[in-house]
């Protein structure tokens, strides 16, 4: 099984250097603390920008001006005010979804948020690879990127610990669950099944989706 977003090209964004990048980079922030702790709001900015382009009701989330050359950093700064890291970064997945929902409300849009927690190895039963696959598949089928929070990277050499990244595609193979992520202005592929087996601290998958207005009676 393979699933991807309908318009991955919408995830190509212009950085402060004037060059196109897959996704965004927290190092674009101006402040040193933001550059250190800004993976969560950076992931949120990328995800909300994509939603604004593919779901017409969510267009106000990121109007074209927010995506213009040289303007995306200002959009990241706007997101920071809602998806705001604390002393330990943005370590609560519910804070991520609630921040996105609050930002959406500030622009007249409604979102719904869902979280699949993956506890640390010694604190309870983890969701299976199949459960993670189903969560990801439902989000991608709805044309919504997924935010992946990773507290410890396990045996994955290309994934930072204590880190948020947007997840934009998935391919299931025999004993592997290959996921495409955007990280540091680059596209990478990780094996989520291997991460589930080897990460000691776990993490979470989070998704925000359009919440349709109730129909008028």
List each language-model region with its residue ranges:
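Short, flexible/disordered intra-domain loops and linkers
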Residues: 64, 122-126, 157-160
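Active-site signature of cysteine proteases
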Residues: 130-134, 139-142, 149-217
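Non-transmembrane alpha-helical segments in soluble domains
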Residues: 48, 101-104, 137
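Mature extracellular "passenger" or substrate-interacting domains of secreted, surface-exposed proteins
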Residues: 33, 40, 103-106, 112
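Active-site-adjacent structural segments surrounding the nucleophilic cysteine of cysteine proteases
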Residues: 1-99
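Short, amphipathic alpha-helical segments
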Residues: 38, 90-94, 126-130, 142, ...
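Internal catalytic-core helix/loop-beta-alpha segment
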Residues: 106-143
């Amino acid at each position: 099984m393979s699933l991807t977003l309908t318009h991955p090209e919408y995830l190509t964004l212009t950085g402060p250097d004037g060059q196109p990048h897959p996704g965004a980079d927290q190092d674009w922030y101006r402040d040193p603390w933001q550059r250190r702790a800004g993976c969560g709001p950076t992931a949120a900015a990328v995800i909300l920008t994509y939603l604004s382009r593919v779901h017409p009701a969510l267009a106000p989330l990121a109007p074209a001006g927010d995506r213009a050359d040289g303007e995306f950093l200002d959009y990241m700064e706007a997101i920071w005010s809602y998806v705001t890291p604390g002393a330990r970064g943005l370590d609560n997945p519910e804070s991520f979804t609630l921040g996105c929902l609050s930002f959406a409300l500030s622009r007249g849009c409604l979102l719904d948020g869902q979280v699949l927690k993956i506890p640390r190895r010694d604190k309870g039963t983890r969701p299976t690879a199949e459960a993670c696959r189903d969560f990801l598949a439902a989000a991608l089928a709805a044309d919504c990127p997924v935010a992946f929070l990773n507290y410890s990277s396990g045996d994955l050499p290309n994934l930072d610990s204590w880190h948020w990244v947007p997840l934009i595609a998935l391919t299931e193979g025999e004993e592997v669950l290959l996921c495409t992520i955007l990280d540091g202005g680059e596209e990478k592929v990780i094996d989520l099944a291997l991460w589930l087996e080897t990460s000691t601290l776990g993490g979470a998958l989070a998704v925000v989706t359009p919440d349709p207005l109730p129909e008028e009676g």
